[in-house]
Amino acid sequence: MSLAGSRLLFSLVFLVGALASWAAFNLQTGGGLESCSLWSVQRLLLLALGGVNLLAVIQGPGRVGRAVYWGLNLLLGLLGVVTAGRHVLLQNIPSEQLLACLPDMSFMLRQLSWWQALKLTFMGTSDCAEVTWTLLDMSLPEWSLLFFVIMLIFSGYRLWRQLRGARKAVALP
């Protein structure tokens, strides 16, 4: 794929990620949605995905660089699927079976190890079990899961194409 074509794809992923981040931010601030810690992690992953793709657009990487960027997109997509999937799972568990509350993420990161804070975050709270907003009968974590699944599939496909093209380039004398 040409450099211009790869920049276009990275630009597209950046724009979609930026739009999703903007929508999530506006829903929380303008819509008055309370954020649980898992939703904060999902937003952080969205921002990281956007940042990686913006760097790829600015750099205009070669063949190896494109493979690295698609690999990073794949990793972020996988982390997003795990996080959003856990959030969707928590929404299907009665809130009485979950922790009542947790301190905010910044407090947990100051007082606990990174691993302990992540573990507590993934345990979830009753806040994470609440469905406060839906669009087309899908909650925000379900939309997030759909977005990350699409990113995972797209990034996996692009990485596979990149690696397959690299193998062909090496095989040719």
From Swiss-Prot:
Biological process (GO), any one: protein folding
Role according to the record: Required for disulfide bond formation in some periplasmic proteins. Acts by oxidizing the DsbA protein.
Periplasmic side: 27-44, 86-142
Membrane-crossing residue ranges in chain numbering: 10-26, 45-61, 68-85, 143-161
Paired cysteines (S-S): C101-C128
Cytoplasmic topological segments: 1-9, 62-67, 162-173
Main location: membrane
Protein name as catalogued: Disulfide bond formation protein B 2
GO MF term list: electron transfer activity; protein-disulfide reductase activity
Family: Belongs to the DsbB family.
GO cellular component, one term: plasma membrane
Organism of derivation: Pseudomonas fluorescens (strain ATCC BAA-477 / NRRL B-23932 / Pf-5)
InterPro entries tied to this protein: DiS_bond_form_DsbB/BdbC, Disulphide_bond_form_DsbB, DsbB, DsbB-like_sf
Entries under SUPFAM superfamilies matching the protein: DsbB-like
Location(s) in or outside the cell: Cell inner membrane
Keywords recorded for this protein, A-Z: Cell inner membrane, Cell membrane, Chaperone, Disulfide bond, Electron transport, Membrane, Oxidoreductase, Redox-active center, Transmembrane, Transmembrane helix, Transport
Membrane topology: Multi-pass membrane protein
